[in-house]
Every structure is written in structure tokens, then in C-alpha cells.
């Protein structure tokens, strides 16, 4: 399951609640073509990797979160571990790289 993040507080709470689990965050926008293309794949990964937390942040709805995380383009995927420490990031709708990065970190 992918959790939709609606606020900066909700983002921080989700990172805190994850504990030692890997958190994968998809920063996207409704108007972004590549974001729309990779969204179903991102959701399928959430079913496949049940021990990983998947979050979605709409950069238009949560500009403060996107700004704090220094998101410059969409889609951007960020990976967090252990109490919100960022351990990886890449931009672009690259399915293979997304799954490979999860496998490296999990």
C-alpha cells in the first residue's frame, strides 16, 4: 500500500513511524507525464515489498516537503532509513533503477 502524504507533519510522522524499515518516497505531480507512467509500477512495488514503506508526495499539494527535501524535478525518488536519514535519491521514471535501488537497500 502507498500512503499519500498531505502535509509536512504527516511526512515526518511517517518517517518516524517507519523505525528501521526502508522508506521509499515518490515526489510527483498530477501534470507530470513520466510520473503518471511510473505510478502503477510504484504501487505494484508496494505490494511486492511488504516490509518497505512507500509514500507519495504531490509537490503541488506539499510544496514545503518538496522544498525541504530539495526536490528539483519530477518524478524524484528518495530513500530513507532509520529515523529519517536519507540514504539514496534519483530522478526520472526509471523502473529498473527504482527496483534495483530498493533491492540494494532492503
Curated annotation (Swiss-Prot):
The active site is at residues 32, 35. This is Thioredoxin. The modification N6-succinyllysine is found at residues 8, 95. In the fully reduced protein, both Cys-69 and Cys-73 are nitrosylated in response to nitric oxide (NO). When two disulfide bonds are present in the protein, only Cys-73 is nitrosylated. Cys-73 can serve as donor for nitrosylation of target proteins. It comes from Pongo abelii. SUPFAM superfamilies: Thioredoxin-like. Signal peptide: none annotated. It is found in: Nucleus; Cytoplasm; Secreted. The keyword Transcription applies. The modification S-nitrosocysteine is found at residues 62, 69, 73. The keyword Electron transport applies. Disulfide bonds join 32-35. GO terms for cellular component: cytoplasm; extracellular region; nucleus. The record marks 26 as: Deprotonates C-terminal active site Cys. Coiled coil: none annotated. The record marks 33-34 as: Contributes to redox potential value. Residues 3-106 form the Thioredoxin domain. Keywords: Acetylation, Activator, Cytoplasm, Disulfide bond, Electron transport, Nucleus, Redox-active center, S-nitrosylation, Secreted, Transcription, Transcription regulation, Transport. The gene is TXN. The lineage of its organism: Eukaryota, Metazoa, Chordata, Craniata, Vertebrata. GO terms for biological process: positive regulation of DNA binding; response to radiation. InterPro entries: Thioredoxin (IPR005746), Thioredoxin-like_sf (IPR036249), Thioredoxin_CS (IPR017937), Thioredoxin_domain (IPR013766).
Amino acid at each position: 500500500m502507498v500512503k499519500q502524504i498531505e502535509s509536512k507533519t504527516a511526512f515526518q510522522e511517517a518517517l518516524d513511524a517507519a523505525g528501521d524499515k526502508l522508506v521509499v518516497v515518490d515526489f510527483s505531480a498530477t501534470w507530470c507525464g513520466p510520473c503518471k507512467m511510473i505510478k502503477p509500477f510504484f504501487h505494484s512495488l508496494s505490494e511486492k515489498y511488504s516490509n518497505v514503506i512507500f509514500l507519495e508526495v504531490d509537490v503541488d499539494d506539499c510544496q514545503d516537503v518538496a522544498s525541504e527535501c530539495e526536490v528539483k524535478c519530477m518524478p524524484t525518488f528518495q530513500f530513507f532509513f532509520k529515523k529519517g536519514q536519507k540514504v539514496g535519491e534519483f530522478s526520472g521514471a526509471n523502473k529498473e533503477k527504482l527496483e534495483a535501488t530498493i533491492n540494494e537497500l532492503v
